[in-house]
Design a protein with these regions (language model features):
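Positively charged n-region of N-terminal signal peptides that target proteins for export
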Residues: 1-4
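C-terminal partner/receptor-binding element of secreted or periplasmic proteins
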Residues: 21-47, 111-136
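Bacterial N-terminal signal peptides
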Residues: 6-14
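Sec/Tat signal peptide C-region and signal peptidase I cleavage site
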Residues: 15-20
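Intrinsically disordered, low-complexity regions enriched in small/polar residues
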Residues: 8, 27, 37, 65, ...
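Mature extracytoplasmic domains of secretory-pathway proteins
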Residues: 46-106
């Protein structure tokens, strides 16, 4: 019985480790040229943004991010990534929503803990999904 328990524990640990290794972060996504191109265009056309937001364009940028989450709107599955300023996540953060294959990206950003600003002209449904993901 003891061997069975040990074997089960080892299997669970291996599965958890494999699952964590398969999670995709923004740093992984932007290695795909389509994602990087969409994100670069979004930030370039957004006007004046805090300097930390440019860090999301780097595969080893100085920001904090979490693994991808998904939202389906109108039958389309979007990828959601959040990123925040290192050491100040509560006040400076953004949520990014990528269309399939990185074809386009929209975002919501909060600067200095103030109101949300949407980038890329997301639809009302996309804004709702961005806001919901941001508040999690």
């Amino acid at each position: 019985m003891r061997r069975l328990c040990c074997a089960l524990i080892l299997m669970c640990a291996a599965c958890a480790s494999a699952a964590a290794a398969n999670q995709i972060y923004l740093t992984d996504a932007i290695k795909n040229p389509a994602y990087l191109r969409a994100l670069t265009g979004l930030l370039k056309n957004a006007g004046k943004l805090p300097s930390w937001t440019r860090q999301v364009l780097k595969t080893s940028g100085d920001y904090v991010g979490t693994p991808v989450a998904y939202s389906t709107i109108g039958g389309i599955r979007y990828e959601l990534f959040d990123a925040c300023k290192a050491h100040d996540c509560g006040n400076n953060a953004m949520e990014l929503m990528f269309a399939p294959h990185g074809a386009k990206v929209w975002a919501v950003i909060v600067q200095d803990g103030k109101s949300m600003t949407y980038l890329g002209s997301p639809s009302a449904a996309q804004q709702a999904a961005l806001k919901e993901a941001f508040q999690k």
